[in-house]
Amino acid sequence: GGYMFKVDRLDAGEVGIRPLAGQSFGNVGISGPGANVLAWVNPREVSLDPWKRVTPAQSTWLAGHIGEAWMTLSSPTFNDPVSGYAKYWDVAAMIDHHILNTATKNADAFRLSSYWHKPRYGKLTAGPIWDFDRAEGSTDGRDFDWGTWTTGGGTDFFTYPWYSEMFRD
């Protein structure tokens, strides 16, 4: 099937999509208990309907696939058009996702509030975009000053894993 997941806090009762032994997703998301863990969106991890609940096999497969994709980003041949990151990632969607979140100064982007999906037979795809309540001059403060694009504090838009590695290409 197809899958949707997110970089965000886990809901009650969830354990998330965790990297397999020897793999990493990079330092995605927040620090603390939810760090380096992705949360399921569809199918759900916790659902009363067993047909809408993710299976252990699905979770293991997606974790392994994301781990392989991450490993290509740190390989010496990461930018090889056949065996590098483009084999796993929808690059155009990554670029669009990054531009939309960065141009709107979305303080939650990349570390929280980031949806991703993996269409059946498709590549890992950024989006759909969401959660702009802390963007474009909101009361957050970090989204008002353009000088905070690379100051840390959750607004270092060009160093988040997955994206930062692709920016080397």
Question: Where does each model-flagged region fall?
Answer:
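Phosphate/dinucleotide-binding and metal-coordinating scaffold of catalytic cores
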Residues: 1-169
